[in-house]
Amino acid sequence: GEALYSQVQRAVDQARGEGADYVIMVGHLGDNGITEKWSSRSVIANTTGIDAAIDGHSHEVCVENVPNESGEMVVLTQTGTKFANIGKLTITTDGQIQASHVSAVTDAEGNPAKDAEMESFINGIKSQYEESLKVVLGRTDVDLMDKDPETGLRAVRKAETNLGDLCADASRYMMGADIGFMNGGGIRAGIEAGDITYEDALSVFPYGNMICMAEVSGQKIKDALEMGVKNYPEESGGFIHVSGLTYTVDSSVPSSVVLDEKRNFVSVGGEYRVRDIYVGEEPLDVNRTYTLASHNYWLKSGGDGMSMLMGCPILKDETMVDVDTITSYISEYLGGTVGEEYKDPRGQGRITIK
């Protein structure tokens, strides 16, 4: 945290020194569901000279005044996600800074306004891919959920869902591994009951991660699970959906995960929140090795701070793109249809949270 604040302060001081009348910080830090010392509010609270902060990452819609290190108010704003709003930041002639959101762009009559040239350009791009995106790859008899079925709020970053189960199963089965891991942050959309098109699959996995299989110790498996729930009950992109494994989270135990300055896992400094970890019917043995299927983002790059997984022997290296694992699993192992096995939107009871 301190290194970040110092670097931001140096940049602000440099801008002021070069004659800037106003300093607007643009960041992708966020606030909810992340480590507090790296939040936009913490940066503001530990610096001076910033007039306004335009932030992102946590998909919040907000306009707030946040005190800086000297107690002066700084405008903090976010516009949500997926172009739900257009942000507007205005510096008035008397030096006041005002932030607002525009949720709909309309013409003089109040109708949705579209730029004809831009719409034509976008439609031209869409037409190039329309045919391939609409190819039917399988079917699901159930809604595959990334959200809580009751609240409609995103669930995959803090709870088991049937789609999370399916994605983890796809990796494990296609790699022939003991265990499958999939991060909640990598599951970007749900799939409604009906035909599954290539576009549907790409909506779930838009990043093109490659699936690998590694040899990983039981201790590293346990550490990864602990890392995945360090923020609970807040969201975490590193929340782990599992296949071939079950575990319980005791949320009454405070997280004691120790991170380095880059938010990578270092150790667990106290009691583990995860317990009752089973691989199949057997308790996890921290002293033996298992084969783990996941994507290169975790197994090779240590994404989401999963540094404990880096350096493990890679047994199958980037054999399939993540989208293909879903469709191949459905066709080869489920007979082309996702059915009763995945009917519960909250999954198959692989993750118990107390």
Located regions from the model:
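Catalytic centers of hydrolytic enzymes
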Residues: E69, G80-K354
